[in-house]
C-alpha cells in the first residue's frame, strides 16, 4: 500500500445529494428580483449570452464551453458553442458502454469539466446556431437509450437505432461546420477553438501530496480524470491571476450553503472569514462540501465594504438581478471550490 493514504470519498449519501445538484433548486426559481447588493466590477471579461440548462444535469458542459467562448472573445474572436452536440456524442458513447458492459454501466448525463475537453477532442464541436434544441429532457432520453441498448442484439443494430432516436429527439447532425466562409469537420472546428492541453484541471486537498496529479474522488469523475493538487493559497492566486490576465476560469464546487442564492445573484458563507487548508479538507471529508455545480468565473468585483467577489456566469437563465451572473465572495470560493480548470499560461 502507498505511504500516502488514499481515502475513498465515493459517498453513500452522495446519491441523495446528486439529485439536487447542478440544476437550479425550485426555491431559487424567482423572477424579477431587485438587486439587494451593490458591487463595483474591477474586471469583467466578455461573454456570450447566458444560457439555461433547464432540468438537465449538464452544468459541466455549459460552464466549460462558456469558458472557451470567453477565452476567444478576449482574443477578439467570436464563438458560441453547442451543448447539444456534446451531449449527443456523450449519450452515444455511454450507450455503447452500457451495451458492452451488459447493462452494468448506468447511462447518465453528469460529468466534470475535463470530460468536456475530452469529448471536444474526440468528437469535435459545433456552433450553437448550427445545432441546438431547447426542449430536450436529457435525463428521459438517457433512460430511453438504456432501454434501447438492453433490447439490441448487437452493436450495429444498437448504433443504427440509437442514431435514429437521437436524430428524432435532438436533430440530424450537420455533416460540416461553416464559419466565416470556411468549411470544417467537427473535429477541425473543435481543434480551432480548443487545442489539446490548452487547459489544466487543478484542485486543493490534503489527502494527496501537493504538486502531483491525482484522480479526484468525486462521484461524477467516473472517467478518472486527474487533477493537479496545489495548496489553496496557490489555487486562489492562480484563479485571480488568470482572470486579471483576461483568461476565464471554469469553477466546480458546492452550492448547498444557505448563502448561495441565484435569485439574489450572490453566494456568501454564513461566517465570512478565510478558511484554512485543514478546514477545507474537513468539509470535504464530512460531506459539507460536495461537488454540485459548475460555472465560468469571468470577473472580479468588490462591495461597498471592500469585500472581494468573483463574478460567475451561470447557466440557469437570466432571471436574477445580474442577468444570470452571480457574485461569489472570495471566502466562498476559497472554502467551497472543489476544482477549477485554468488556461495553461
What residues fall within each predicted segment?
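Bacterial N-terminal signal peptides that target proteins for export
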Residues: 1-11
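C-terminal motif of bacterial Sec signal peptides marking the signal peptidase cleavage site
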Residues: 19-21
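Bacterial Sec signal peptide processing site at the extreme N-terminus
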Residues: 23-33
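Active-site signature of cysteine proteases
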Residues: 25, 48, 163-345
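Active-site-adjacent bridging/hinge elements
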Residues: 31-43, 90
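Active-site nucleophilic cysteine motif
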Residues: 54-68, 107-114, 293
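Structural recognition of the beta-strand scaffold that forms the well-ordered cores
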Residues: 58-61, 85-88, 93, 116-119, ...
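Papain-like cysteine protease catalytic cores
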Residues: 80-181
Amino acid at each position: 500500500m502507498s505511504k500516502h493514504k488514499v481515502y475513498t470519498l465515493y459517498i453513500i449519501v452522495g446519491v441523495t445529494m446528486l439529485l439536487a445538484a447542478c440544476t437550479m433548486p425550485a426555491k431559487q426559481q424567482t423572477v424579477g428580483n431587485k438587486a439587494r447588493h451593490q458591487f463595483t466590477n474591477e474586471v469583467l471579461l466578455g461573454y456570450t449570452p447566458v444560457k439555461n440548462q433547464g432540468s438537465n444535469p449538464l452544468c459541466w458542459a455549459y460552464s466549460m464551453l462558456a469558458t472557451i467562448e470567453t477565452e476567444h472573445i478576449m482574443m477578439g474572436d467570436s464563438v458560441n458553442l453547442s451543448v447539444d452536440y456534446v451531449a449527443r456524442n456523450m449519450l452515444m458513447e455511454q450507450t455503447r458502454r452500457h451495451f458492452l458492459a451488459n447493462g452494468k454501466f448506468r447511462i447518465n448525463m453528469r460529468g466534470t469539466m475535463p470530460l468536456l475537453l475530452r469529448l471536444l477532442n474526440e468528437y469535435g464541436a459545433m456552433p450553437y446556431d448550427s445545432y441546438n434544441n431547447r426542449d430536450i429532457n436529457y435525463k428521459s432520453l438517457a433512460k430511453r437509450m438504456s432501454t434501447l441498448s438492453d433490447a439490441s442484439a448487437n452493436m450495429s443494430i444498437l448504433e443504427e437505432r440509437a442514431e435514429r432516436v437521437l436524430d428524432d429527439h435532438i436533430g440530424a447532425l450537420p455533416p460540416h461546420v461553416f464559419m466565416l466562409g470556411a468549411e470544417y469537420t467537427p473535429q477541425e472546428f473543435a481543434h480551432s477553438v480548443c487545442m489539446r492541453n490548452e487547459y489544466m484541471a487543478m484542485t486543493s486537498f490534503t489527502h494527496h501530496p501537493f504538486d502531483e496529479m491525482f484522480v479526484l474522488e468525486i462521484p461524477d469523475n467516473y472517467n478518472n480524470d486527474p487533477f493537479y493538487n496545489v495548496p489553496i493559497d496557490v489555487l486562489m492566486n492562480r484563479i485571480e491571476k488568470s482572470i486579471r490576465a483576461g483568461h476565464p476560469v471554469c469553477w466546480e464546487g458546492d452550492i448547498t450553503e444557505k448563502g448561495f442564492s441565484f435569485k439574489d445573484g450572490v453566494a456568501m458563507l454564513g461566517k465570512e472569514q478565510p478558511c484554512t487548508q485543514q478546514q477545507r479538507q474537513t468539509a470535504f471529508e464530512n460531506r459539507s462540501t460536495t461537488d454540485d455545480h459548475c460555472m465560468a468565473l469571468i470577473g472580479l468585483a468588490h462591495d461597498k465594504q471592500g469585500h472581494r467577489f468573483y463574478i460567475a456566469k451561470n447557466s440557469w437563465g437570466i432571471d436574477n438581478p445580474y442577468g444570470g451572473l452571480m457574485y461569489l465572495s472570495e471566502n466562498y470560493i476559497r472554502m467551497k471550490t472543489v476544482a477549477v480548470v485554468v488556461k495553461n499560461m
